[in-house]
Amino acid sequence: SAPAQWKLWLVMDPRTVMIGTAAWLGVLALLIHFLLLGTERFNWIDTGLKEQKATAAAQAAITPAPVTAAAK
């Protein structure tokens, strides 16, 4: 019954429950973040690296080599 819910804290230590809850939430948050980082769509760290590499490779292929005095 609702009026007797306070008796639960006579059985369980409130500090232990709060520390356990905080530890579980921290582990859960890390797990969710690492799962998201492992996906292609939701990885916010490597965003745009493939596009930047492709652009750099295309620009390197288009850019002509400098003409030196020995080549003339």
Curated annotation (Swiss-Prot):
Keywords in alphabetical order: Antenna complex, Bacteriochlorophyll, Cell inner membrane, Cell membrane, Chlorophyll, Chromophore, Light-harvesting polypeptide, Magnesium, Membrane, Metal-binding, Transmembrane, Transmembrane helix
Positions with a binding annotation for a bacteriochlorophyll: H33
Molecular function terms, GO-annotated: bacteriochlorophyll binding; electron transporter, transferring electrons within the cyclic electron transport pathway of photosynthesis activity; metal ion binding
Keyword set includes Oxidoreductase: no
Transmembrane regions listed in the UniProt entry: 17-37
Localization, UniProt: Cell inner membrane
Topological domains, Cytoplasmic: 1-16
Membrane topology qualifier: Single-pass type II membrane protein
Gene Ontology biological process: photosynthesis, light reaction
Keyword Ribonucleoprotein set for record: no
Pfam families the record matches: LHC
Matches recorded under InterPro entries: Antenna_a/b (IPR000066), Antenna_alpha (IPR018332), Antenna_alpha_CS (IPR002361), Light-harvesting_complex (IPR035889)
GO cellular component: organelle inner membrane; plasma membrane; plasma membrane light-harvesting complex
Topological domain ranges for the Periplasmic compartment: 38-72
SUBUNIT field: The core complex is formed by different alpha and beta chains, binding bacteriochlorophyll molecules, and arranged most probably in tetrameric structures disposed around the reaction center. The non-pigmented gamma chains may constitute additional components.
Family in the record: Belongs to the antenna complex alpha subunit family.
Purpose: Antenna complexes are light-harvesting systems, which transfer the excitation energy to the reaction centers.
The name this protein goes by in its record: Light-harvesting polypeptide B-885 alpha-1 chain
Originating species: Rhodocyclus tenuis
Lineage: Bacteria, Pseudomonadati, Pseudomonadota, Betaproteobacteria, Rhodocyclales
